[in-house]
């Protein structure tokens, strides 16, 4: 079993209040789910999903400030420190998933979400080490 997308931080959530794994309280809540699955001899992985420009909220962030067709919000362009923070938050979320008892993680890197936004020229207009336009 694989969960639906779990946000690594508030700015990466699909919408404000979206499911996340941000702190020890969230770990405890997720452990309730993983314990139930394991109690039935099942396995469960957690999908980490950072929505990037697809987030439906005013605090969304992305490689470049290009509005998505599915959200009215223009994302804030991340600087290098902000990009590193997003990476660190994804790693921290994977570690919290382990602590919550998940058997694995899947990091969503396709379908136009955050990681994919770095890989596509249309959504990445950067000229630094994180961009296509070097």
Residue spans of the language-model regions?
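Flavin-dependent oxidoreductase catalytic cores
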Residues: 1-134
